[in-house]
């Protein structure tokens, strides 16, 4: 989840994803096997959606691609308070740069340079992705 800009991570490290057993003959999907370009093609639209819905304060839309473990871990009251009171979380710029991808286990971490429309400077965005029930889901997201 996007932190309120004080270097504090609201949604922590990803918990191991519950894995649905693949159908007989189907291989298990593992996002780390994708190329950087394939990962960015998935991650960047998800990051842009997080930025958009954070700016609009639409928590339901913001959380729609969260893994079940991340969705359970986030208190909607705290998230609502963050959206209402964080100048950074409500004023994120569309201007981003991807900085790199880290692969670990069954997750990838995509790093972005994020800017604000109201605050000078740059922030580090972190988006953790993996598969859950055959779909790419967000297992962690933060800005610091």
What are these regions (language model features)?
Residues 2-56:
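Short, low-complexity N-terminal intrinsically disordered segments enriched in polar/charged residues
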Residues 3-4, 94, 129:
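Generic detector of low-complexity/intrinsically disordered segments
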Residues 8, 19, 28, 48, ...:
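Arginine residue identity/basic-tract feature
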Residues 13-20, 57-63, 90-94, 116-122:
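Short, charge-rich amphipathic segments
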Residues 34-38, 83-86, 97-99, 110-114, ...:
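Short secondary-structure boundary micro-motifs
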Residues 42, 79-80, 127, 141:
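Conserved short hydrophobic patches within well-ordered secondary structure
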Residues 44-45, 49-55, 59-107:
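Short solvent-exposed beta->alpha transition segments
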Residues 100-144:
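Exposed beta-sheet edge and beta->alpha loop/turn motif
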């Amino acid at each position: 989840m996007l932190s309120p800009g004080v270097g504090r991570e609201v949604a922590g490290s990803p918990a191991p994803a519950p894995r649905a057993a693949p159908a007989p003959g189907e291989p298990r999907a593992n996002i780390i096997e994708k190329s950087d370009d394939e990962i960015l093609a998935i991650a960047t639209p998800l990051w842009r959606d997080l930025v958009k819905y954070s700016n609009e304060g639409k928590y339901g839309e913001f959380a729609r691609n969260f893994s079940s473990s991340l969705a359970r871990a986030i208190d909607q009251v705290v998230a609502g308070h963050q959206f209402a009171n964080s100048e950074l979380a409500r004023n994120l710029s569309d201007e981003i740069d991807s900085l790199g991808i880290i692969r670990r286990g069954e997750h990838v971490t995509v790093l972005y340079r994020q800017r604000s429309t109201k605050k000078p400077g740059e922030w580090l965005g972190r988006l953790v992705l993996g598969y859950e029930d055959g779909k790419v889901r967000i297992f962690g997201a933060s800005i610091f």
